[in-house]
Amino acid sequence: MEEKKQQNVTIKGTKDGITLHLDDCCSFSELLKELDEKLSTHYYDGDGRSLIEVHVKVGNRYLTEVQQEEIRTLIRNKKNLVVDSIESDVITKEEAIAWKEETEIVPISKIVRSGQVLHVKGNLLLIGDVNPGGTVIAGGNIFVVGSLRGIAHAGYYGDSDAVIAASVMNPMQLRISDVAMRAPEEKEDGAEAAECAYINENNHIVVDRLQLLTHLRPNLTKLERGIV
């Protein structure tokens, strides 16, 4: 009895086009050969005019940029096919380090004085004050266990879901992503309480009670919820 040949390429039709599931154990050259053979059939000629989107899933195979381009070129050379995405379940060590830096909470204990700038890639937990003229910047959220009287910029790389929270919120300016808010009027003595700032549905920065934060941003991590 002839042994059934291992299928390295599986093609599935979807409402958005077709999805290619590529085996992650065979050699890359074998993969390209079988992909070329299977896409050379007449199944995807369509009406000769409409482009068909192709989503490529490669599982636990890491593809270099050159290999990705080889796959794109092979598919592009077939009639009416265009690559929409190539998805892999693995990342490089460098990508993993960058992701960790962007998502981790960085605890720092200090006073940010006038003229000083404190910048972290991920989420900032500052135990101390931000004095007038001082600036704190984070790629993610900013939590100040102390007085925020300077400038705070959260979501620096474009994260509009980022938040700013402080034990005492009297900033010179707040920025989240590309949205800015000038300081509200100075609070009366004794009226200060922990507050948070976020972008609302109208794309405006709103300052509200800190207790609302876990309801407004339920996707905060367990550690971040513990902070607020």
UniProtKB/Swiss-Prot annotation:
One of its GO terms (biological process) is regulation of cell septum assembly. Keywords: Cell cycle, Cell division, Septation. The keyword Cell division applies. Interacts with MinD and FtsZ. Cell division inhibitor that blocks the formation of polar Z ring septums. Rapidly oscillates between the poles of the cell to destabilize FtsZ filaments that have formed before they mature into polar Z rings. Prevents FtsZ polymerization. Belongs to the MinC family. This is Probable septum site-determining protein MinC. It comes from Bacillus anthracis. The lineage of its organism: Bacteria, Bacillati, Bacillota, Bacilli, Bacillales.
